[in-house]
Amino acid sequence: MHEIPVYRQPFGSSHTSASGATQPVDEHILKLYMRKELGRSFPFAARPRAGQIVQSIADMAHGVHDYSPISGPTKPMDMADAVRKGMNKFEFYKPRDWDNGKDTEEYHKFKEIIPEMAQHAVNGIREFYGDTKFEGEFQRWHQDELIDVPTMLFQDYTGGGRQVDLKCSFPTRNPLKKDGTRSWRFPKPRTEPTPQQIMQQAVYWKATGDEPGLLFVTPLGFNIVDASNCDALKPHALEESYQQVRQRWLVIQNLLRAAEGKWSNLFALVQPDYGQIVGRHGPDILAIAKQIWRLDR
């Protein structure tokens, strides 16, 4: 177990992550406070939860669910059984109640299309690896020489010196029609990764040396993006992206050090974006944010 620097301990900041580097600084600080002082996390939404379910079904179908590098893969599950188990998990999700029914509506729509998307994911993983054996998701660590805590990472699938991350895009709502009904827009699989996705891949590449890949899945199919069709996933570009990630980690590190163990000092160093916070996390989290940022006064 690594030793946490003294200045980080009051904030419960024991590690960095790839996702943490792509998160706005104010939300990162808010997340630390909620976890350390309130024992809470940001509320979930139907969209990311549905993505987890798609991956869970794909994992079971390929025999890499609940993966352990010690015991290795298990027997692949029949697709129908995998879908059934995955959908049972999704039934436990409770939609948000503060967005005028948006999350509830999306939850019910996603229930209709998860099985189809999971099949696309299974097919895409199979195409990416072919006969190559691969591992499922488990906790890994990376130590950057300029950062005084390790980086925790979870790669979706790795094998044969290559890794691929599953990225799901779900339908979005169109405006209500005059008769009160609504249609949905079904996106095509992406052909280019977002800057945040490139940063995440850069961390994985730096930590493991695995060639990065992204498997984009929608209800319409899948598309695989890697260095063969995307310059942003080639080594020179990944190195540039990694340096951006490192710089963001350093910003957080310097802020925590400058705060001298006091939340009030930390809040005074960071300007909150209340509009982004309420839009992403709802009025309850906004109320917490407004309360804690008063501590800097």
What are these regions (language model features)?
Residues 1-154, 295:
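Metal-dependent nuclease catalytic cores that hydrolyze phosphodiester bonds in DNA/RNA
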Residues 31, 62, 172-175, 207:
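Active-site-proximal flexible loops/turns
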Residues 31-38, 168, 220-226:
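Short acidic (Asp/Glu) and glycine-rich catalytic loops that position anionic groups and cofactors
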Residues 47, 190-194, 235-238:
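Flexible, glycine- and charge-enriched loops at secondary-structure boundaries
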Residues 49-56, 199-207:
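Short amphipathic alpha-helical face segments that pack within enzyme cores
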Residues 130, 159-162, 207-211:
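Short glycine/proline-enriched coil/turn segments at helix->beta-strand junctions
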Residues 140-200:
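Non-catalytic protein-protein interaction segments used by genome-maintenance enzymes to assemble
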Residues 203-297:
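Metal-dependent nuclease catalytic regions and adjoining charged, substrate-binding loops involved
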